[in-house]
A protein has these predicted regions:
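Anion-binding alpha/beta catalytic cores of soluble intermediary-metabolism enzymes, centered on
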Residues: 1-47, 51-234, 239-243, 248-298
């Protein structure tokens, strides 16, 4: 079981080397991350984008493009389509976003002709290495689904569980976190949490243990759980935090990064291959970890 993000680099190296297809690769932070991943032996890369800019960035930043295939395409919409096409044709295993809008890339991924549209919902899964926590902490969904209903949360959980399984966490503990840890008919998030827990107990959601509603405090602190008299397999030992909406996930994730000094990695799940998105605000390590995470999952 992977307990620290730095361990996923070695895990990725032990697995079969994958090929990453980068859409609109003419972006300095993305090129730096991809070159580092190639140097580390995690991936080979296909760069789709403005070749002149790609080569110029590499020269200015002393980046070794080595044997990477570069496909010259200045139009970002066409670059996204070509990057996706490489995966559809089996020439690459997964996709990374470069210098283009997320919606542009996902439109290409979900194009019916591309063949990468999955059967379910796209959701964002972040993995945090928090110094104050005893293992990796997964957070979902703070990036894709604004206000998920119960049926959406089932798919969001399943997507996160797939990521946990890829990191050799066999039976991840899922905490649907809410403002309170009791079912309140006036608070939909608590009703959804209770339903998810019951569905898990009856085998409708497999591969994990779900217990909720739980407050954030008792989801990650056994002392807080004991103080409130909560007896739970998940309390104080959560692997996956399921947030009620995108705002909660966004705020919590950024709090872990900026106040908790956490390092992170993230992917979009739900298509036939993972999609790696990195923020300009991410550290170089986080970008590298995201590429490694995508390689392990794909």
């Amino acid at each position: 079981m992977v307990k620290k993000l730095e361990e996923i680099l070695e895990l990725a190296k032990k697995r079969e080397k994958k090929v990453i297809s980068v859409a609109a690769a003419h972006d300095k932070p993305v090129l730096e991350a991809v070159c580092e991943a190639v140097k580390f032996g995690i991936v080979d890369a296909i760069l789709v984008g403005d070749k002149e800019k790609i080569v110029s960035i590499a020269k200015d930043e002393d980046l070794d493009l080595g044997n990477m295939e570069i496909i010259d395409e200045k139009d970002v919409v066409k670059a996204a389509a070509k990057a996706v096409e490489f995966v559809s044709q089996g020439k690459a295993h997964y996709i990374m976003k470069g210098l283009l809008g997320t919606s542009t890339l996902l439109k290409a991924v979900l194009n019916k002709d591309a063949g990468l549209r999955g059967k379910g919902l796209l959701s964002h899964v972040m993995v945090y290495d928090v110094p104050a926590y005893h293992k990796l902490l997964f957070l979902t969904d703070g990036g894709m689904v604004p206000y998920p209903e119960l049926k959406d949360k089932i798919e969001i959980v399943n997507n996160a569980v797939k990521v946990a399984h890829a990191l050799d966490i066999e039976n991840p503990k899922v905490a649907p976190i809410c403002a309170v840890e009791v079912v309140n008919p006036s608070m939909q998030a608590t009703l959804d949490a209770s339903a998810l827990s019951q569905m898990n107990k009856r085998g409708q959601i497999k591969g994990c243990i779900i217990d909720g509603p739980l407050g954030l405090d008792n989801a990650v602190s056994i002392e807080a759980a004991k103080h409130k008299g909560i007896v739970s397999e998940v309390a104080g030992d959560s692997d996956i935090l399921l947030v009620p909406n995108i705002e909660a996930g966004n705020f919590l994730g950024k709090s872990l990064t900026y106040f908790g000094n956490a390092v992170n990695a993230g992917v979009i799940m739900g298509a036939k291959c993972p999609v790696v998105l990195v923020s300009r605000a991410d550290t170089a390590k986080s970008k590298l970890y995201s590429i490694a995470l995508g390689a392990i999952i794909s």
